[in-house]
Structure formats: structure tokens, C-alpha cells
């Protein structure tokens, strides 16, 4: 065994990460790292990997936004369809009760709804239907509207300058929102422009029996004129 040179200088390298004197973490030169210097091209690959991840995140974000938009549109469409179905069902039920309202109108004409339990029932039913959005229309003197009114009698020649108005209401019409549930059956008269006012061709009143028959059958009624007209 050959002994070493007793005068050879021994070099001791302190590889401790923390300096025992200062307590601070020592910086390690790049060449002293366990892996040595970074392999060539690693920086470029890291940059390319980062770009790829950014593109992937952008793609997934776009997909998520598209799915969210599709769901929002679906939810709006579902709510709209649900409301439409609800309105249709409501209109169907209320339409079945219009005949009852006609009976109440005839009872009111005969004075049967002036007081008593029947008046209370009629008022409560009409209040409930009004709360659901039911609106009655068809009033004497208002302009005739073929969208809302069905004319079963007509007085006047409809000449130039005349305007058709409702002269008699044989059966009220009803609307639910913008939907016409039933047209009003009316008698129409033509107004003629006069001096500062309008002259109206008058139709003789129709008794309640005739109104009932016309409201149920929808037959035309021959207008009656008073003597001297």
C-alpha cells in the first residue's frame, strides 16, 4: 500500500445547503446541481408545452361558454313552453265557464241578481275569473271591430262617411290577455256625420228572449224600426 504524500493539500468542499455561520440558504452554482447543467433544448420544450396548455385552456373555456349559452337558451325555451301550456289550459277551463256567465247576464237583466245568494255567487265567480285575466267586451256605442265583434244584424246602408258602431249587445265577448276566447254578438248601426254631432240609425230594442235565442243559435235578427223613422 503506497502512502500518500504527507504534504499534499487536502481540499474539503462544504456541500451543506445552509451556511452554519449565517443560517442562510446557500446558492448552488448551476454546474454543481445534481443533474448538472440543463440539457440542450429543454427550455424550448418547456415553452412549447406552456403554449400548448394555454391553447388547451382557451379551447376548453370556449366549449364551456358554448355549453352555458346552450343551457341558458334551453332554460328560456322550457320556461316559455311551460307558460304557453299553462295559458292554454287556463283558457280551456275558462271557456267552459262562459255559458255560466251568460246565464248570470240573463238573470241580471231580469233583476234576479239585485240581491240574494245568487248575486253573491255571480260576484265571486266573476271576481275570480277577472283575477285570472278574463276581460269582457262589447258595449253599446263603441266602434265595431270585426276582430272582436260578430255582427248578427245591421242597420244602415254603410254609405260614404258612415261609421259602424255597436247598437245592441246580444252576447258579451271575452278575452284572456291578448287571446280572444269568444267574439261578442252585436247589432251594428251606421253613424252619419251631422252638424257638430253624429246621427245614429237606431235599432229597436230586442227583448231578452230574442237575445237568448240569438246568443245560443247565432241566427240573424231582422231589425225593427219605430214608426216615423
Curated annotation (Swiss-Prot):
Q: How does it assemble?
A: Homodimer.
Q: Which GO terms describe its cellular component?
A: cytoplasm
Q: What is the lineage of its organism?
A: Bacteria, Bacillati, Actinomycetota, Actinomycetes, Mycobacteriales
HAMAP family attached to this UniProt entry? GrpE
Pfam families linked to this entry? GrpE (PF01025)
Report the family membership: Belongs to the GrpE family.
Compositionally biased spans, kind Basic and acidic residues:
13-24
Name of this chain's protein: Protein GrpE
Please explain the role this protein plays, according to its UniProt record. Participates actively in the response to hyperosmotic and heat shock by preventing the aggregation of stress-denatured proteins, in association with DnaK and GrpE. It is the nucleotide exchange factor for DnaK and may function as a thermosensor. Unfolded proteins bind initially to DnaJ; upon interaction with the DnaJ-bound protein, DnaK hydrolyzes its bound ATP, resulting in the formation of a stable complex. GrpE releases ADP from DnaK; ATP binding to DnaK triggers the release of the substrate protein, thus completing the reaction cycle.
Q: Which keywords accompany this UniProt record?
A: Chaperone, Cytoplasm, Stress response
Whether Cytoplasm counts among this entry's keywords is yes
Which region ranges are annotated with the description Disordered?
1-49, 207-229
Q: GO: which molecular function terms?
A: adenyl-nucleotide exchange factor activity; protein homodimerization activity; protein-folding chaperone binding; unfolded protein binding
Q: Which InterPro entries match?
A: GrpE, GrpE_coiled_coil, GrpE_head
Under the heading SUPFAM superfamilies, the entry gives:
Coiled-coil domain of nucleotide exchange factor GrpE (SSF58014), Head domain of nucleotide exchange factor GrpE (SSF51064)
A single GO BP term for this record reads:
protein folding
Q: Which CDD domains match?
A: GrpE
Keyword NADP: yes or no? no
Compartments (UniProt record): Cytoplasm
Q: Which organism is it from?
A: Mycobacterium leprae (strain TN)
Amino acid at each position: 500500500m503506497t502512502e500518500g504524500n504527507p504534504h499534499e493539500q487536502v481540499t474539503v468542499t462544504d456541500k451543506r445547503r445552509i451556511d452554519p455561520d449565517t443560517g442562510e440558504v446557500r446558492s448552488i452554482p448551476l454546474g454543481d446541481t445534481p443533474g448538472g447543467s440543463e440539457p440542450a433544448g429543454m427550455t424550448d420544450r418547456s415553452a412549447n408545452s406552456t403554449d400548448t396548455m394555454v391553447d388547451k385552456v382557451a379551447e376548453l373555456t370556449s366549449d364551456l361558454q358554448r355549453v352555458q349559452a346552450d343551457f341558458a337558451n334551453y332554460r328560456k325555451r322550457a320556461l316559455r313552453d311551460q307558460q304557453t301550456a299553462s295559458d292554454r289550459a287556463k283558457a280551456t277551463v275558462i271557456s267552459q265557464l262562459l255559458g255560466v256567465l251568460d246565464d248570470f247576464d240573463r238573470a241580471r237583466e231580469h233583476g234576479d241578481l239585485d240581491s240574494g245568494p245568487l248575486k253573491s255567487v255571480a260576484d265571486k265567480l266573476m271576481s275570480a275569473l277577472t283575477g285570472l285575466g278574463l276581460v269582457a267586451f262589447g258595449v253599446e256605442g263603441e266602434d265595431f271591430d270585426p276582430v272582436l265583434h260578430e255582427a248578427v244584424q245591421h242597420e244602415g246602408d254603410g254609405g260614404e262617411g258612415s261609421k259602424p258602431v255597436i247598437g245592441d249587445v246580444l252576447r258579451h265577448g271575452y278575452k284572456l290577455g291578448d287571446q280572444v276566447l269568444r267574439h261578442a254578438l252585436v247589432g251594428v248601426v251606421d253613424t252619419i256625420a251631422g252638424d257638430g254631432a253624429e246621427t245614429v240609425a237606431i235599432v229597436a230594442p230586442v227583448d231578452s228572449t230574442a237575445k237568448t235565442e240569438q246568443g245560443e243559435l247565432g241566427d240573424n235578427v231582422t231589425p225593427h224600426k219605430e214608426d216615423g223613422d
